[in-house]
Amino acid sequence: MVKSDYYEILGVSKNADEREIKKSYKRLAMKFHPDRNPGDVSAESKFKEIKEAYEVLSNPEKRSAYDQYGHAIFEQNSGGMGGSNTGGSDFSDIFGDVFGDIFGGSRRSRSRRGSDLRYDIELSLEEAVKGVVREICVPTLVTCLQCRGSGAKSSASIVSCVTCHGHGQIQMRQGFFSVQQSCPSCNGHGKIIKEICNKCRGSGRIERTKTLSVKIPAGVSTGDRIRLSGEGESGKNGAPAGDLYVQVQIKKHPIFDREEKNLYCEVPISFSMAALGGEIEVPTLDGRVKLKIPPETQTGKLFRMRGKGVKSVRGIGGHGDLLCRVVVETPVRLSDRQKQLLQDLSDSFGGPYGHKNSPKSKTFFDGVKKFFDDLTR
C-alpha cells in the first residue's frame, strides 16, 4: 500500500517551519481524535496518519532523512519507524510521547476516559410534546472509594517501575534512530502495584447502579439523544468519566399521529352534519376545543388548528399545528322509518344516480360514459 505524503497529510508545504507544522497538527488532531469521533473507523485511521506524519516532521533529523529518502528510510531495519509502530501495539502507547502536549498525557501512557453508555427511554406523546423529568437507573462502573481508583491496597503498595525508573517510557534503537516506546512492565504508567485493592481487585472501579434525574425537553422526537456529560463509566487511573446518551423512543398514540411539529387525527362526523354543517368538540393535547364544520363538507377534508401541535425542541419556529381529517360515517342499524326517510331523500336527488347534488359523482359518471362511448366508435 502506497503511503500518503506526510506534508500532504498535515496540509503544509515542504518549506513549512516548526510552528506551522505544530499548528496544523494540533488542529487536525483535535478534529479526528477518537474521543471526539467514537466508533468512527475512518477518523481513527486518519488520526493515526496525522500522528505518524507529525512524529517525523517535528523531529529535525527524521524530517531531513524523510526529505532525502522518503518513506523507504523508515521501512528498512526491522520495519523501521513506519512498519513496526502500527503492528498490534496499543494505539495510545505508540503515540503517547507525541500527543502529550495536546491531551495532557506528558510522555507517559495517557489514561483513557471511561466508556460512553446508552440508555433507551420510552415516552408517551404527551411527555415528548410537553417535556418531562424522569428518574432512570443505569448500571455502570464507578470509581472504587476504597482505593480511590488507584487499584492498590494502599499508597505504600504503589512503587516506581524499575524497568523505566518511573518515566513510563523506554529508549529503543531502530536502525540509526533512537525512539521512545511505552514501558512494557508498567504499561507506560511509571508505577507498579505490588498489592491490589481487595474491593475492586485492582481495577480501580466497581459495578454500581446509579439513579439519575433526566430532564427531557419539550418537542423531542424518536431517535433524539440527550447527552449527560460525565455520567458514563468512570475512567481508569483517575481519567475522566465517559458520557451517558439517553435515546428517545415515543410510544404510538391511540388518537394522534405525529409528523415533525404537526399532529394529525381523524374525526368522525355524521352524514347530516357533513351536509348541513355544525360544531363538534375535538381532542388536543391541551384539552378539548370546538371545531366548526361548514355545510357540504366532504369526507377527507382537513381542518388546521394552528398552534395546537408540537413545540420546536430548539425553540425555533414556535408550535406546529393540529390537522383534523373528517370522516363522514355511513349510518348503520337504521329503523324502517329512517330507511324510508333516506329513500325519500334519495328520490328527491333524482335517484342513486342523480348528480345535481353530487358534483363529484356527476364528474365520475360523465367520465365513465365518455370512456365507453370512445370504445364503441
From Swiss-Prot:
- Zinc finger map (CR-type): 131-209
Q: Which SMART domains match?
A: DnaJ (SM00271)
A Gene Ontology cellular-component term: cytoplasm
Q: Which CDD domains match?
A: DnaJ, DnaJ_C, DnaJ_zf
UniProt-listed GO biological process terms: chaperone cofactor-dependent protein refolding; DNA replication; protein refolding; response to heat
As cofactor, the record names: Zn(2+)
Molecular function as annotated in GO: ATP binding; heat shock protein binding; unfolded protein binding; zinc ion binding
Tell me which Gene3D superfamilies the record gives.
DnaJ domain (1.10.287.110), Heat shock protein DnaJ, cysteine-rich domain (2.10.230.10), Urease metallochaperone UreE, N-terminal domain (2.60.260.20)
- Annotated Zn(2+) 1 binding lies at 144, 147, 197, 200
| Repeat found in the keyword field | yes
What domain of life?
Bacteria
Q: Which keywords does UniProt give here? A: Chaperone, Cytoplasm, DNA replication, Metal-binding, Repeat, Stress response, Zinc, Zinc-finger
Q: Where is the J domain?
A: 5-70
* Keyword Zinc assigned: yes
Q: Any idea where this protein resides?
A: Cytoplasm
The record's annotation in Pfam families points to:
DnaJ, DnaJ_C, DnaJ_CXXCXGXG
Which note does the record give on the cofactor? Binds 2 Zn(2+) ions per monomer.
**Sequence positions that bind Zn(2+) 2:** 161, 164, 183, 186
Main function: Participates actively in the response to hyperosmotic and heat shock by preventing the aggregation of stress-denatured proteins and by disaggregating proteins, also in an autonomous, DnaK-independent fashion. Unfolded proteins bind initially to DnaJ; upon interaction with the DnaJ-bound protein, DnaK hydrolyzes its bound ATP, resulting in the formation of a stable complex. GrpE releases ADP from DnaK; ATP binding to DnaK triggers the release of the substrate protein, thus completing the reaction cycle.
Q: Which family does it belong to?
A: Belongs to the DnaJ family.
Note the subunit structure: Homodimer.
What UniProt notes about the protein's domains is: The J domain is necessary and sufficient to stimulate DnaK ATPase activity. Zinc center 1 plays an important role in the autonomous, DnaK-independent chaperone activity of DnaJ. Zinc center 2 is essential for interaction with DnaK and for DnaJ activity.
Q: What is this protein called?
A: Chaperone protein DnaJ
Q: Please name the taxonomic classification of the source.
A: Bacteria, Pseudomonadati, Pseudomonadota, Gammaproteobacteria, Enterobacterales
